[in-house]
């Protein structure tokens, strides 16, 4: 993936998932990708009232305008998603809902996490149809990290058996996203989007 955006959406005081976001940024950078972390809390979009497309050109809030340009320029997306009450993080969902066409025709991968042993699996189930509805191809390979605070240290470096399992799963996960990103770039160059 030449240009990858990694999205993270927790607003909690003790954000454990940021460790996984940093891990993903580092590992994809080591593979040669141009990676940027998009932290929903840092971007600071309000609760959804108006989507980006509902503003006149040049009239969207500056943070929304800047993020729209980054989304359009990206070849692929990676959502680092925590599981909240059997579902998706509200902060990450709110950020994604501000955009629509900007997401179209690119692959998206999911790396989920939780404090418990289920590794964010239920968040993954919620995100797959959402990403598809928003015009992305949700790639079939996912990563789930259970007990995230034990699997990654504060710098996002793997620790213990959970960290070992993550490292072992990463290369296949990244290769699948790379394949879909290459396919999307080639098809867009060859034929262009259907609309």
What positions do the PLM features span?
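Short, solvent-exposed amphipathic alpha-helical segments in soluble enzyme
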Residues: 22-23, 96, 126-129
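Short, glycine-/small-residue-rich phosphate/pyrophosphate-handling segment
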Residues: 108-149, 164-168
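A generic structural signal for secondary-structure junctions
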Residues: 52-53, 97-100, 132-135, 182
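N-terminal beta1-alpha1-beta2 submodule of the flavodoxin-like/Rossmannoid cofactor-binding fold
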Residues: 1-94, 158-195
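Amphipathic alpha-helical interaction elements
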Residues: 9-13, 100, 116
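His-Asp phosphorelay/catalytic-motif detector in bacterial-type signaling
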Residues: 104-106
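Charged helix-capping and loop-helix junction motifs
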Residues: 91-98, 124
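Mobile beta-alpha loop/short-helix "lid" or hinge segments that flank ligand
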Residues: 36-47, 101, 136-157
């Amino acid at each position: 993936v030449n240009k990858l955006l990694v999205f993270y959406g927790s607003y909690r005081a003790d954000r454990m998932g940021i460790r996984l976001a940093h891990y993903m940024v580092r590992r994809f950078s080591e593979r040669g990708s141009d990676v940027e972390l998009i932290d929903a809390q840092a971007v600071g979009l309000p609760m959804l009232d108006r989507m980006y497309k509902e503003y006149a050109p040049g009239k969207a809030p500056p943070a929304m305008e800047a993020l729209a340009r980054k989304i359009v320029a990206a070849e692929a997306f990676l959502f680092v998603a925590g599981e909240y009450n059997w579902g998706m993080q509200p902060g990450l969902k709110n950020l994604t809902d501000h955009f629509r066409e900007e997401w179209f025709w690119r692959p998206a991968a999911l790396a989920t996490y939780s404090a418990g042993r289920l590794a964010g699996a239920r968040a993954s189930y919620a995100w797959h149809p959402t990403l598809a509805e928003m015009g992305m191809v949700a790639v079939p390979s996912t990563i789930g990290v259970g007990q995230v605070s034990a699997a990654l240290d504060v710098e996002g470096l793997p620790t213990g058996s959970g960290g070992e399992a993550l490292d072992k799963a990463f290369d296949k996960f990244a290769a699948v996203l790379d394949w879909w990103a290459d396919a999307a770039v080639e098809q867009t160059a060859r034929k262009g989007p259907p609309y």
